[in-house]
């Protein structure tokens, strides 16, 4: 099959029963050890970086209304560019990686992660993204969704440690969850998926997403620059949230990556979380092309 990811098209969904999963198109990449991350020595020189940043800032002049915190992150953060079998091919600013024009015309596929954090009652922590987020503002999504950055600690391929380090960092940044509440060894990378989704006419996502699960009772202190609201939900409460989103009630919207996971994987994986058998669901050799 083609390795080209399909454009996410919003449509009505219903939460599948735990026994109604359909076969999914998948990519079967080589073993992760065969994908050697691009060394940090390929970074541009400081002078080249300065020129590139100046050009990018000039291109972004029309975005003067962008929130200052989000603007800084857009230009300071460097995403990890990958190919469709998750081999590192370079790095690019978060700004360029999320411009829909560049996504459609060039290789802006980048590595990402999405965290599903459950408490000891097996309730899932959701967040509503802040109104100032550049992509998908005010949508409800799973616990934390972001990117590992092009830095040594987040490029570590062995045991997916780089991605787990990034998840710990962003749980603190977005939700104020202390690192000691979410030890990196407690994250379970369950699988990976590749998807593309527009946010509006200008911004969008094209990600190779690591799906990370963790069961911990944590302290939460949301960062208002990142998060508008939070809630824990059980299965029935999630079904009601999906119903409202499908019906367009209360202006409620869900992120496309969260919806893809809900409709394709979450009920079965939630079963494993409750039974303490999540390791049986792990498949990190497959990339689901959704």
From Swiss-Prot:
Record GO biological process: chlorophyll biosynthetic process; dimethylallyl diphosphate biosynthetic process; isopentenyl diphosphate biosynthetic process; photosynthesis
EC supergroup of this enzyme: isomerase
Reactions performed catalytically: isopentenyl diphosphate = dimethylallyl diphosphate
EC number: 5.3.3.2
InterPro entries: IsopentenylPP_isomerase_typ1, NUDIX_hydrolase-like_dom_sf, NUDIX_hydrolase_dom
Residues forming the catalytic site: 145, 207
Domain called Nudix hydrolase: residue spans: 108-260
Alphabetical keyword list: Chlorophyll biosynthesis, Isomerase, Isoprene biosynthesis, Photosynthesis
Pathway: Isoprenoid biosynthesis; dimethylallyl diphosphate biosynthesis; dimethylallyl diphosphate from isopentenyl diphosphate: step 1/1; Porphyrin-containing compound metabolism; chlorophyll biosynthesis
Any Pfam family: NUDIX
Record Gene3D superfamilies: Nucleoside Triphosphate Pyrophosphohydrolase
GO molecular function: isopentenyl-diphosphate delta-isomerase activity
GO cellular component: cytoplasm
Family statement drawn from the similarity comment of this UniProt entry: Belongs to the IPP isomerase type 1 family.
Function, as annotated: Catalyzes the 1,3-allylic rearrangement of the homoallylic substrate isopentenyl (IPP) to its highly electrophilic allylic isomer, dimethylallyl diphosphate (DMAPP).
Protein name (database record): Isopentenyl-diphosphate Delta-isomerase II
Organism: Clarkia xantiana (Gunsight clarkia)
Encoding gene (name): IPI2
